[in-house]
Amino acid sequence: MNIRHRRQRATLAIGLLVFAIVPLTVLDPRTALAADGVTANEAKGMGLSTQWRGSKGLVTKGADGKVIFLYGEVQPSVVCSPLQVCDIELQGGEVVRDVLVGDTVRWKVEPRHRALAGGQAIHLIVKPSEPGLVTSMVVTTSRRTYHIQLKSHPTQYMARVGFEYPEDVSTKLADVNARLEASTIPGTGVPAEQLSFSYSISGSAGWRPTRVYSDGLKTYIQFPRSISGQDAPVLFVVSGGQNRIVNYRMKSNMMVVDYNIDRAVLVSGVGWKQQKVTISRGGR
């Protein structure tokens, strides 16, 4: 072995010795966050928020190519493109209170209205000014709050976006059960297949009706069993823009109205304790 080879071996041995003595330093993300003034609870909260925003939720195809997100499951991410329009459709009957966008300079959001049989539907028209943008949007309505992420892509975009609501699924299931059980409800005298269940119920009172249906002459409003023995809410039928009282009677937890109603309001309490529930024929 010549002198040069001996020197190379010695240099290699010294390098290995130094590597063994000096420990490998791994930067803990929590240490980095602490250095930025973020507490452990704040870091945990940001991690949970990131997990919710980045989770893969249910996305399905609706009518006319609409992309359907399940409301409340995850933060939906809507992809738009410059020179194109993204149409985000909210639930029929919702009233928009406020729209907040993180980047108001490069994103434009304009509300539009569409008439429905039972009211109107709000459409949010979203347009980015350039590709490669990411921001967030919060939409507050009369029923709920939407947290939506907006992204812009050079060419790809979602033309129509909508939502499926868990409470709607519950309502549809209740309607199915109502059809199966209606023939056993006293007082109707009409086969289940001849009853109309096309009513929507909006409101969050504790006595909120579980279902509403009509036999063509009378309207039946069924409340939770817990209302039995308690003061029932007062029923007002909306006609010509005014509320008027019609004849009705209570049978246990069932309100029987001697009228085929299209729109009505149930009211309980006064002042700040007042609770209201709206009943509408033909959906929201």
From Swiss-Prot:
Key words of the record: Conjugation, Plasmid, Signal
Pfam family, one: CagX
Highest taxon in the source lineage: Bacteria
Signal peptide location: 1-34
Keyword Transmembrane: no
Keyword Signal: yes
Annotated TM spans: none
Family: Belongs to the TrbG/VirB9 family.
Name of the protein: Conjugal transfer protein TrbG
Source species of the chain: Rhizobium radiobacter (Agrobacterium tumefaciens)
Phylogenetic classification of the source organism: Bacteria, Pseudomonadati, Pseudomonadota, Alphaproteobacteria, Hyphomicrobiales
Gene name linked to the record: trbG
